[in-house]
């Protein structure tokens, strides 16, 4: 399976100049823990970073910095892991594990943002596949037992 098949195409995004209170409200309103920060190139969103709820807590609140003094671009993570739409989902999982990230933007070959994959999405896929494999094993055992009776 390719990344494009699993990714959520409803990505909540922010600009670098968005205020932290606005970003936090957007996260709350959209029920997400991160915002993909984008710049626009020829009208297309290009991911340049990610802001997580944890970033807000660690970088601002724990340091007692005024929310009005910083913007998304000041605290977002710039070293953004991105995967292309045609990458194998197992390769995506390995890259996420190696970098220690739970969410990764999916981009087109031209670098345009097309979706996002969360670790939970991969876990759900694997869980479904394992469940189906388990059912096959149980069905084969039942068929074998029926043949012998």
Give the label of every model feature segment.
Residues 1-9, 50-84, 88-97, 118-149:
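Tandem CBS (Bateman) regulatory domains
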Residues 10-13, 46-47, 82, 112:
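Short, flexible active-site loop motifs that bind/organize anionic cofactors or intermediates
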Residues 12-13, 40-45, 64-67:
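A broad, low-specificity signal for short, low-complexity segments enriched in glycine/proline
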Residues 13-32, 37-39, 83-100, 106-107, ...:
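The conserved cystathionine-beta-synthase
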Residues 19-20, 58, 115:
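Generic signature of intrinsically disordered, low-complexity, basic-rich segments
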Residues 27-30, 35-55, 96, 104-120:
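A glycine-centered beta-loop-beta connector
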